[in-house]
From Swiss-Prot:
Its EC number is 2.7.11.1. This is Probable serine/threonine-protein kinase MRK1 homolog. Pfam families: Pkinase. InterPro entries: GSK-3 (IPR050591), Kinase-like_dom_sf (IPR011009), Prot_kinase_dom (IPR000719), Protein_kinase_ATP_BS (IPR017441), Ser/Thr_kinase_AS (IPR008271). Belongs to the protein kinase superfamily. CMGC Ser/Thr protein kinase family. GSK-3 subfamily. The gene is MRK1. May play a role in the initiation and completion of mitosis. The keyword Secreted does not apply. Disulfide bonds: none annotated.
Amino acid sequence: MATLSQKKLMESVRLMEREWVKMHKALVRSRCGEVKEVRYRYVEMIGRGSFGVVVKIMDDRHNFFALKRVYQDRRYHNRELGILMEVDHPNIVRLVSYFHTDKTSSGAYLNIITDFVGMNLEEYIKANRGVETEEIRSVYRQILEGLRYLHEKNICHRDMKPSNILIDTNGLVKICDLGSAKVIKSGERNITYICSRFYRAPENLLDYKEYDFKIDIWSVGCVIAEFRHPGPIFKGDTSGSTLNRILEIVRVTSDDLIGLGCLKPDLKQGVGIRKYLEAFFSDPDLLEVLEKSLAFSPCKRSTASELLRKQFFQQAHE
C-alpha cells in the first residue's frame, strides 16, 4: 500500500508534467536566509524515487538547475535540507534555494533547488567503458574528498550509488541526493535497511545496527569496480543472495562474522576481492585501494582519509 508521501508524489508528477511547462513564480529562501522571487519553468524529468522526483528547471535568465520535490509529512522531519544548508564542498551538490508549496494540515511539498549537472556516474560509465585509469583516479579521488568532508562532519551519506554521483563535462564530480544522509554517533543504533541493495555493506545486510561511515566506503568501492566490471559486482535479487555473492568473492574470517553478530559454521572462503578484480583491473595501486574499500569487516576497511593517502592517489601529484 502506498504511503501518504508516495501518493502525494504521484500527484506531484502529474502536476509537473501538465502545468510546469510555463514560467512559474515562487518566493524562495537561499541557504543564507535571503528571500526573493524567482521565475522558472519545467524542462524535463531527471529521475524519480519512492519519495521524491527530480526535474530540470530553467530560470528566466536561461540558467539550468535541478529541483527535487518531496512531500513532507508534518509527522516527520526532513534531514536532507538541514544537511544541505550545512555543507559546502566542491564535490557535493550545492544548495541554491528552497521553498514550500501546497501547505495543508498534513504536510507540504518541499522543493530543493541545487546545481544542475548533466550526467550521473551510471550514465557516464555506460558511455565510457574501458576508460583510462587516470580518469578512474580522478573520479575516485573526488568522491573520497567529498566523503571525507561529510564524514568529518559526522554525516553518513547512506546511499552511495552511481546514480547519486554526478559528473560534468569538465570531469568535476559531485555527490548528490542526501535524502538518506544522517549525522551518526559512535555506538548509536540505526536502521540497516538503507542504501541500494547492490551497494549495501555487509554490516547492513547482516542487520548490524551500530555501523559507521565505513558503509559509504564499501558502496564507493562497488561503484568504482563497475568502471571495468560488467555491471554491479555484488548483484543479488535479495539481501540474502547479495550477501552470498559477497561471501563467494571476498575473503571472510569467522571473527569477521562474529564481530557483526553472525555465526556461519559452514563458511567457505571466497577467492579474494583482489584476485577477483585482477581479471578487470591491471593497476596494482588501484587494486590495493579497492581491496581496502571492500574489506568485509568495517574494522579492516579504510576510511576516506586513509584511502586518499594511498600511492594510487599520490601519483597524479608527483
